[in-house]
Amino acid sequence: MKVWMWICLAGLAAGVTLLLCRSTAETQPTDKPSADNTEKPASASPSFTDPAKLTEKAPETFKAQFDTTRGKFTIEVTRSLSPNGADRFYNLVRSGYFTDIAFFRVVPGFMCQFGIHGDPNVSAKWREAPIPDDPVKGSNARGTITFATAGPNTRTAQLFINFGDNTGLDGQGFSPFGKVTEGMDVVDKIYGGYGDAPQFGGHGPDQGRIQMEGNPYLKKDFPNLDYIKSATIVSADGSK
């Protein structure tokens, strides 16, 4: 199913979606199962401001631990499931990209989405660094993690974790590369009270404004959102 996503690349104006100063159709996870104070974004570490330098091949298996405002959860990645996706995720985690990143789109029973950086300058760089698609080898079962897309070969830094068995996404090119193996109860508690994005009948954040304004917009207008505090690689190929 097509969805509309906004990410304005030049002169950001007025899910996951792209707005190149126009709205574009995106193949997004949208097949839902039936039935603070304003602040400046923290300055970005050079380690994640240059995507071209973050291309290290991921271990065949590794675990990443996420510390969030709801608690901790661990994702186990199997590179063979989605090599390009696993490599991108590995580099995002090890660079510190996920510090203070919001779960900005949370649809109970469906999925929670994250990955737009709190600094618009950083987001802009990653939008211009897509990775090639991977064949879908796994299913979007409960607890799996998958990159959002804006069409063929457009995966960048936005991801989602499936709350349910969303097998309908498998035929749409969403290629899971890992799964939550510890702390799925934490993931289930991520705040979803705002519902989906406005264009889908919810009251959640507008992705175009996140891209333009970053975390200050989210923390001012959506104070109940949960955030990733940090993410770290905790094991690779089974060794600490």
Which residues does each predicted region cover?
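Cyclophilin-like peptidyl-prolyl cis-trans isomerases
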Residues: K2-K240
